[in-house]
UniProtKB/Swiss-Prot annotation:
Keywords: Calcium, Glycoprotein, Lectin, Manganese, Signal. The keyword Protease does not apply. Monomer. InterPro entries: ConA-like_dom_sf (IPR013320), L-lectin (IPR016363), Legume_lectin_dom (IPR001220), Leguminous_Lectin (IPR050258). This is Non-seed lectin. One of its GO terms (molecular function) is carbohydrate binding. Most highly expressed in the epidermal layer of developing shoot tips. Gene3D superfamilies: 2.60.120.200. It comes from the Eukaryota. Belongs to the leguminous lectin family.
């Protein structure tokens, strides 16, 4: 875990302001709550939007709560996001922030987890992706195309021996990890920044107790993903663990040959 120094925080905030000020080809949306009937979000699997403005990715109402009942749910922004421009080769920079709560009412050792991911625009829940595969990886094939930030509750054979936050590139064998200080029922806030000139993906994780962790990895998104992508969340659980998104915002800017702004508030 890395503590965030003031100079580094100012640098990241500066990047955020640059992104927000550049109106070349941009997409922006902000959901302080995610209300039922929101057509800007596509639900897959067990995901549903609750009346209180929470996006529930997995089922958590099994009775008794100790029952083993696998659940997989995903939620995607319905509009494809321009990631890179084929004419210029330019790649978008973006900032996304979200908050979530994972609740483990059974008291058993929680399993599986949640991932924010970027994938091809036609992405669906893969076959063989339940449980430890977090709804993004088909365990029967090596062809999986995505970039993600995972919050993993359980150490599987391919994981570090701890609950962890990991940056994933086409695999759940994370390229970089830090410890995930999970507390059932607590609100976690996340900001992810991709700086395209440096190909740097950075995440800042703020826990409810004020503790801050960071994780960063160099990744060329143009080499991994198509020019238009889907962005969203996926979660899996094997017991009655709920993975709930409370808020989500996203802003991207791409220097392209023609420009427009797409906004959803």
């Amino acid at each position: 875990m890395a503590l965030y120094r003031t100079k580094e925080l100012v640098s990241l905030v500066s990047i955020m302001f640059v992104l927000l000020a550049t109106n070349i080809e941009a997409l922006s949306f902000n959901f302080p709550k995610i209300t039922p009937g929101n057509t800007a979000i596509t639900l897959q699997g067990n995901a549903k939007i609750l009346a209180n403005g929470v996006l529930a990715l997995t089922n958590s109402t099994q009775i008794p709560p100790t029952t083993t009942f696998p659940s997989t749910g995903r939620a995607l922004y319905s509009t494809p996001v321009p990631l890179w421009d084929s004419a210029t080769g330019n790649v978008a920079s973006f900032v996304t922030s979200f908050s979530f709560v994972i609740l483990n009412p059974s008291g058993r050792v929680p399993t599986d987890g949640l991932v924010f991911f970027i994938a091809p625009p036609d992405t669906e829940i893969p076959n063989n992706s339940q449980s430890q595969y977090l709804g993004v990886v088909d365990s029967k094939t090596s062809i999986n195309r995505f970039v993600g930030l995972e919050f993993d509750l359980y150490a599987n054979s391919f994981d570090p021996y701890m609950r962890h936050i990991g940056i994933d590139i086409n695999s759940l064998i994370s390229t970089k990890t830090v410890r995930y200080n999970f507390v059932s029922g607590s609100l976690t806030k996340v900001t992810i920044i991709y700086d395209s000139p440096s190909n740097t993906l950075t995440a800042v994780i703020t826990y409810e107790n004020g503790q801050i962790s960071t994780i960063s990895q160099n990744v060329d998104l143009k080499a991994v993903l198509p020019k238009d992508v889907s962005v969203g969340f996926s979660a899996t659980s094997t017991i009655a663990v709920s993975h709930n998104i409370h808020s989500w915002s996203f802003t991207s800017n791409l220097e392209a040959t023609t420009g427009n702004i797409v906004s959803q508030v």
